[in-house]
Every structure is written in structure tokens, then in C-alpha cells.
């Protein structure tokens, strides 16, 4: 029985190993990035511990490549920004730019294609974008 519990513990540990966490500067928003079955990138967003998005799948489907599955995480970078910028027009003459950032680098081992997903969590929202670094196996894409 102890041996079975030990095996179950390590199987569960492995399923959480690929999950990455990011929180907003005030700690109210929490994002979890994970790889689902078949290397499908996904994320979850909580506000004050309650789910806002339970499972959002990520990726790009193009005419040239399927960038929605078959990924392995190869790198992770984090950053925090807290500065101000001055808009040219609008209600405010100074705007605070305050967020925590996480960039996840994914690679498809079968194709060698690389996709970066950059998440930014502000106190009042989430933004993310796909970045396709220059690479031999992908000269152009039609989305």
C-alpha cells in the first residue's frame, strides 16, 4: 500500500511540474500556464482565488503550420515593470505602467518550430501575445 501511494505521489508531482504561476502586482490575479495532453499549451486565470477562465487553449493554426499542439517548454523568463508614460491626449497626463511578465518558450520537437508566449498581468487585467522568433523552418505564416 505504501509503495502504491509513493508511485501515485510522483505521478501527481509530474503532472504539476510543467505548470507555471504568475501573479499581478497586487496579488489579486493569478495565472497558471500549463501543458495539457499532447503538448497543448493552456492557461487558467483566477481573481482572488476564484476562477475567471478555467482552461484557455493557446496556439496558432496557420496554412503552413499547426502551432496548437506537440510543444515542450524549453525556457521561462520573468520580469516586473513599474514606470510611467505620458499620453499625447486623453483624460490623464501621466499613466502608470505596472505589471508582472512571464515569457514561456515552447518548441515542437517534431518540427523544430519555436513559439514564445508573453503574458502580462496588470492589477486590472491580463494581456498575452504570440512571438515567433526568426527560425529556419518558418519563413512566413498565413494566419
Label for each model-derived stretch:
Residues 15-19:
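Sec/Tat signal peptide C-region and signal peptidase I cleavage site
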Residues 21-143:
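N-terminal accessory beta-strand-rich subdomains and adjacent acidic, glycine-rich linkers
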Amino acid at each position: 500500500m505504501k509503495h502504491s501511494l509513493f508511485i501515485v505521489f510522483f505521478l501527481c508531482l509530474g503532472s504539476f511540474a510543467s505548470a507555471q504561476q504568475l501573479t499581478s502586482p497586487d496579488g489579486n490575479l493569478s495565472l497558471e500556464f500549463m501543458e495539457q495532453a499532447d503538448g497543448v499549451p493552456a492557461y487558467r486565470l483566477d481573481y482572488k482565488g476564484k476562477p475567471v477562465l478555467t482552461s484557455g487553449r493557446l496556439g496558432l493554426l496557420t496554412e503552413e503550420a499547426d502551432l496548437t499542439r506537440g510543444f515542450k517548454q524549453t525556457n521561462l523568463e520573468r520580469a516586473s515593470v513599474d514606470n510611467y508614460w505620458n499620453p499625447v491626449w486623453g483624460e490623464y497626463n501621466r499613466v502608470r505602467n505596472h505589471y508582472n511578465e512571464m515569457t514561456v518558450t515552447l518548441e515542437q520537437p517534431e518540427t523544430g518550430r519555436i513559439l514564445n508566449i508573453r503574458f502580462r498581468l496588470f492589477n486590472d487585467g491580463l494581456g498575452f501575445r504570440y512571438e515567433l522568433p526568426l527560425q529556419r523552418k518558418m519563413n512566413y505564416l498565413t494566419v
